[in-house]
């Protein structure tokens, strides 16, 4: 019997999912992206070579793994084909092992134009999107007007739908945002070229996944972003436009909940987020700068600096509940090397002194909250590239043990560096 494992981020994204997915694919035959778009970058470092994947599942770097982009992903054909060619330039045979859902909504140039125009228009109130058209594409999907991958292969139908959509979106672009219109003919020509390149790779992904399941193959579902960017459960409105929680596997890949065997939650040993929004444990002092520098905390896609702060157990507890997480993988422990004191947020305190054990549901409700910290001693020894738990400094082990105690869940994996081998596996999710 094969196992079906979900890997997802438990914070605000950028937790190091790509490396862990790549590592786990040594035991998987199939890897699936089930939500998001090319706004999230998964960074892999193998034998000193860094690769950033945005749409293509991280399993593509393993020669015997079949990779799927499922219906929950909003797909930019331009971004996907660019990524394919980049990987092919590095000698990776992508097209024979990549399959794309016919039901993926398309991200087209007008989505990108709308995304950028809105952010500019909002000024200081901007959400801080990546400007890649993700939100507007999901809007079209929910409004039942989206063009999907399958539409590309029906020229007349596609042209008619595109004409109607462009009339609508160009009106908003030109009349409200005072931006140039997107040209119909050039977009139609480009779309037909995309269709020919994508045609050999498309399929009914859900049906394919169930065939793999029936054959007893191991399937790994690769999440993008993190729990607190979820459109429903995140720090709304400072969120992404998709569901990033485990339930998105069910809708975004057509895979029933009873088939999921294990959920691995990825968390940094501290906390980061990109863009605006609440961040209770954010550090604006020299310690925060030190963590950012040591952790090289810059967005893989945008290059934007990440905000850094202490580990927030309040947020993690809720992530565990929302996703029925089986075990944790803690990443970037080595970034904390050399700090005298470490802090873990175990609760929040409001302006009246009331102690809150759960995070609020709306971003504005974080404004008057302060974290309640538990302090632990740091360590001066290096944890970089350690591969055996007993070789970690005693205080590092104590820090991890305390996280387990507070959260009531085991740490099953630990990442001590960017390379595949810089990992401690205490429990293999596929075993």
Swiss-Prot record:
CDD domains: AdSS. It is found in: Cytoplasm. Its cofactor is Mg(2+). One of its GO terms (cellular component) is cytoplasm. GO terms for biological process: 'de novo' AMP biosynthetic process; IMP metabolic process. Keywords: Cytoplasm, GTP-binding, Ligase, Magnesium, Metal-binding, Nucleotide-binding, Purine biosynthesis. GTP binds at residues 13-19, 41-43, 306, 332-334, 415-417. Plays an important role in the de novo pathway of purine nucleotide biosynthesis. Catalyzes the first committed step in the biosynthesis of AMP from IMP. Homodimer. This is Adenylosuccinate synthetase. The lineage of its organism: Bacteria, Pseudomonadati, Pseudomonadota, Gammaproteobacteria, Legionellales.
